[in-house]
C-alpha cells in the first residue's frame, strides 16, 4: 500500500528576481531555464524545467546550452496568419544562456 503525499507549492527564484512556482507532491532540487536578452534590452526567463537531483539539473543545463547555442543571434519572428509566413521583427536574441537555480526552502 502506498501513502500519498499531499501536494505543496514549491518556488524557485530566478537571478533576475522572477519567481517560478509549481504545485507538486514530488521533491525537486533545481529549476533550470533559459534566459534571453534581446537587442532592445528586454530580459526574459523561459519556462523552467524542474529537476529532482543535481545530476539531472546538470543534464537539463547541458540540453539548455545546446538550445541556447542555436538561438544566439537569431531574429525574433512572428507568424503572419493572413499571409501564412514568418515576419522578422528587427529584434535579435543577443544573449541566450541556460541557468539552474536551487528550489527555495
Where in this protein do the model-derived segments appear?
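Short, mixed-charge low-complexity intrinsically disordered segments
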Residues: 2-18, 63-105
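Positively charged, low-complexity intrinsically disordered regions
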Residues: 9, 23-27, 31, 54, ...
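Short aromatic-glycine-(Arg/Gly/Cys) micro-motifs in beta-strand/loop hairpins
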Residues: 18-48
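Extended low-polarity, hydrophobic cluster-rich segments
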Residues: 30-34, 47-53, 91, 98-100
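A short, exposed loop/beta-hairpin motif centered on an aromatic-Gly-Thr core
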Residues: 39-63
Amino acid at each position: 500500500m502506498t501513502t500519498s503525499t499531499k501536494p505543496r507549492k514549491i518556488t524557485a527564484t530566478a537571478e533576475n528576481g522572477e519567481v517560478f512556482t509549481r504545485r507538486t507532491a514530488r521533491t525537486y532540487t533545481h529549476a533550470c531555464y533559459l534566459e534571453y536578452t534581446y537587442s532592445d534590452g528586454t530580459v526574459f526567463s523561459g519556462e523552467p524545467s524542474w529537476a529532482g537531483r543535481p545530476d539531472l539539473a546538470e543534464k537539463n543545463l547541458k540540453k539548455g546550452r545546446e538550445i541556447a547555442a542555436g538561438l544566439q543571434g537569431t531574429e525574433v519572428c512572428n507568424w503572419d496568419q493572413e499571409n501564412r509566413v514568418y515576419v522578422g521583427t528587427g529584434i535579435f536574441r543577443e544573449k541566450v544562456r541556460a541557468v539552474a537555480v536551487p528550489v527555495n526552502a
